[in-house]
């Protein structure tokens, strides 16, 4: 049940990443308002997802009798701090149409970095970390 909730949030994040990609392809100038709306919606989904992991997932896995599970969980927690900073910087820099339009090239570069980082993290969580939920 817990795993399904996290995967549902992952799909929502990936859907928003794809939505932003399409908007960028359609033209930043004409899509800036929609881009900022998508970024702000994604920020909300990510904040809820991270809060749930912090409150439920990580404590569960850190209680595991398996030292490997505890070590991997700690590593994921540390990595999340770095990813959260990358995403927060992106969201703060591009959460309005005017910010996006004032630095279109920077927006595209930052979005590509964020998209890659989020997809990489989601893939790793689903193929490794979430498999430990039933073993914890």
Task: For the regions a language model picked out, list residue spans one by one.
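Small-residue-biased structural context
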Residues: 1-136
